[in-house]
From Swiss-Prot:
Lineage of origin: Bacteria, Bacillati, Bacillota, Clostridia, Eubacteriales
Induction: By heat shock.
Matching PANTHER family: ELECTRON TRANSFER FLAVOPROTEIN BETA SUBUNIT LYSINE METHYLTRANSFERASE
UniProt similarity note: Belongs to the methyltransferase superfamily. PrmA family.
Amino acids binding S-adenosyl-L-methionine: 163, 184, 206, 248
One of the record's GO molecular function terms: protein-lysine N-methyltransferase activity
Name recorded for this polypeptide: Ribosomal protein L11 methyltransferase
The UniProt record lists the keyword S-adenosyl-L-methionine: yes
EC number: 2.1.1.-
Protein function: Methylates ribosomal protein L11.
Catalytic activity: L-lysyl-[protein] + 3 S-adenosyl-L-methionine = N(6),N(6),N(6)-trimethyl-L-lysyl-[protein] + 3 S-adenosyl-L-homocysteine + 3 H(+)
Major localization listed first in the record, in broad terms: cytoplasm
One GO process term, biological-process aspect: methylation
Length: 311
């Protein structure tokens, strides 16, 4: 007999997707599905980039709906309270929570499996990178590089604009001599992409122990051995300098990092930063210039910005 699960639906803005997902992964969540109107809009404009596309997502209107799945246990009510309180605090960090409403439904185990997995299909991100969930079959073309990811535990699955732009930038700048640092690695998707692009050495760092565990497991699924994942912050656990540093976080954290980035970046090295909403782009750009960076690229998708700067 199927066991009961809880489905928690959060109605929010596209801007808050990454932040809300982070909140959910601070609870004992077993799976997350994201329905984002910005993703649907992008997919409609770029139909040739998608090998599969769930037509049910076309029903998504403005903003985003994030669905999370939990076992029916005594800790569930505490998780819901934490989610609601954390979403209410997003505005304190300059993040638009949208409606910020939380709804709870009971579903059986079979429904959870179907509801969660149907949103994740093989997705072409850049010119070469294809992100594939573990349970899907996909035969890459000769020029494609496939990333096997487990979205159930992931903090980044490749579908969000910020992740997509960072991967596209890595495609342009990574070469076989490059050493790459991924700050706030989450699921490890950017670190794995850099390794697949034949970087000499890749280092991923995250303050969240759950993210570190997820990244290490995703690395195993991809059979890459030139990656190291560390638990901690940039200043305390990283040694040496990189040719490329990538950080897909939020503008406030990036601005805090910028003065220290040049201590870890080689001369003529590149700093790729995203997780920046349009309204904060100039703030980050000015901070980069103040710290002796040259702005090479400013790219945007939806409401998000990705900046490539050179030291």
């Amino acid at each position: 007999m199927d066991k009961d699960w809880f489905e928690v639906s959060v109605i929010t803005s596209s801007e808050a997707v990454e932040a809300v997902t982070g909140i959910l992964y601070n609870t004992p969540v077993k799976g997350v599905a994201i329905e984002d109107s910005k993703d649907v809009e992008f997919k409609k404009k770029h139909p040739g980039d998608w090998d599969y596309f769930d037509e049910s997502l076309l029903n998504v209107k403005d903003g985003a709906v994030i669905k999370a799945y939990y076992k029916d246990d005594h800790n569930f009510d505490e998780s819901v309270k934490y989610i609601e309180e954390s979403i209410d605090k997003l505005s304190e960090f300059g993040i638009n929570k949208g409606e910020g409403k939380v709804f709870v439904n009971k579903v059986n185990e079979t429904d959870w499996e179907n509801n969660w997995k149907k949103y994740y299909k093989p997705t072409k991100i850049g010119a070469r990178i294809v992100v594939k969930p573990l349970w899907e079959e996909y035969t890459p073309k000769d020029y494609e590089l496939m990333l096997n990811m487990d979205p159930g535990m992931a903090f980044g699955t490749g579908t969000h604009e910020t992740t997509r732009m960072c991967i596209q930038a890595l495609e342009r700048y990574v070469n076989e001599d490059a050493e790459v640092f991924d700050i706030g690695t989450g699921s490890g998707i950017l670190a794995i992409a850099a390794a697949k692009l034949n970087a000499k050495k890749v280092l991923g760092v995250d303050l969240d122990s759950v993210a570190v565990k997820a990244a290490k497991e995703n690395i195993q699924y991809n059979n890459v051995n030139n990656i190291e994942i560390l638990h901690g912050n940039l200043m305390e656990v990283v040694q040496g300098k990189a040719d490329i540093i990538v950080a897909n976080i939020i503008a406030d954290v990036i601005n805090i990092l910028i003065p220290d980035i040049n201590k870890f970046l080689k001369t003529d090295g590149y700093f790729i930063s995203s997780g920046i909403i349009k309204d904060r782009a100039e703030d980050v750009i000015e901070n980069l210039k103040k710290n002796k960076f040259e702005i090479i690229e400013v790219n945007n998708q939806g409401e998000w910005i990705c900046i490539v700067a050179k030291l």
